[in-house]
């Protein structure tokens, strides 16, 4: 089969969105500047926080977008304030590192309503280890540390609805219930690959009344009658000898949009985390997701098939 060809129909708008990604005021907007310092009355004893959670979030987002270290991000933001003639200071890099362990970074979008199709996948983000070239030439060393980023993406808008970071030894199916519980929006169907073909995942989808589009593994058997979605997939597999027809008829192939989201993460922000503490790494990953959702909202390509 010849490769399909598509034409972008909103190139002018999308091109402006791509250019806007490099704008400093796109990431450091008036809302962040006005709420830079903490104004709320402290609810506990001790020294009050000087900088707001939004300020810490903004620093972490800029750090990821421009691929800076914490020290470089501090100097970068201070220079922006100087050029803007704004009487603000960037939080000290040690303050950001400490606050990142407890800050709650929101990546929720303003989109509301039913989600027709949620697609789910995970990818690895490296914390420690050699680059691919060294591994190719000399082999890998023993110490290689990874974290797993789990994403649930709206297949229509490309917005990340749910996100979580886990240790490398946490399986996709184990992380699934906590991931899907992050949203209370109605979801019509959810797609995931064969790694999620477990009762734990299917039970969570049944609890939320979501149609499960998870391909059963080769030679899979039937489950009790309440797992109707899976049993239909198993029956189709036995009739045709594979899951190919089932994937085509159920629109399962839309799950590739989750892989597109993973590709965007690696291409735009790199495939590694730099903070040393695990809680800080969670904040760094959520800042990454927040930045990606902001880019998505600014503009995405719209295309039509031409061949």
Curated annotation (Swiss-Prot):
InterPro entries per the UniProt record, alphabetical: Tn903_transposase, Tnp_DDE_dom, Transposase_Tn903
Disulfide bonds: none
Cleavable signal peptide: none
GO molecular function: DNA binding
GO BP, sorted A to Z: DNA recombination; transposition
Other facts noted in the record for this chain: Transposon Tn903 codes for kanamycin resistance.
Function of the protein: Required for transposition of transposon Tn903.
Protein name (database record): Probable transposase for transposon Tn903
């Amino acid at each position: 089969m010849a490769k399909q060809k598509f034409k972008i129909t909103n190139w002018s708008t999308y091109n402006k969105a791509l250019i806007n990604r490099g704008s400093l005021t796109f990431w450091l907007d008036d809302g962040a500047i006005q709420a830079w310092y903490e104004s709320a009355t402290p609810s506990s004893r001790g020294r009050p926080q000087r900088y707001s959670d939004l300020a810490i979030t903004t620093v972490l987002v800029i750090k990821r977008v421009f691929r800076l270290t914490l020290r470089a991000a501090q100097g970068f933001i201070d220079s922006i304030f100087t050029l803007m003639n704004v009487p603000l200071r960037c939080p000290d890099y040690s303050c950001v590192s400490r606050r990142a362990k407890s800050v709650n970074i929101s990546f929720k979008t303003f989109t509301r309503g039913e989600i027709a199709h949620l697609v789910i996948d995970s990818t690895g983000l490296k914390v420690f280890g050699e680059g691919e070239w060294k591994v190719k030439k000399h082999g890998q060393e023993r110490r290689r540390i990874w974290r797993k980023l789990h994403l649930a993406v709206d297949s229509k808008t490309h917005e990340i609805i749910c996100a979580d970071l886990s240790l490398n030894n946490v399986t996709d199916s184990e992380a699934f219930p906590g991931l899907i519980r992050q949203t209370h929006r109605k979801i019509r169907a959810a797609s995931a690959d064969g790694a999620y073909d477990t009762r734990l995942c299917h039970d969570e989808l049944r609890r939320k009344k979501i149609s499960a589009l998870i391909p059963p593994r080769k030679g899979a058997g039937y489950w009790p009658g309440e797992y109707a979605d899976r049993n239909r997939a198993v029956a189709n597999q036995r009739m045709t000898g594979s899951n190919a027809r089932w994937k085509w008829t159920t629109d399962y192939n839309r799950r590739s949009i989750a892989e597109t989201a993973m590709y965007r993460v690696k291409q735009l922000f790199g495939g590694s985390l730099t903070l040393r503490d695990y809680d800080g790494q969670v904040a760094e990953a959520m800042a990454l997701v927040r930045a990606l959702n902001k880019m998505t909202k600014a503009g995405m390509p719209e295309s039509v098939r031409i061949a």
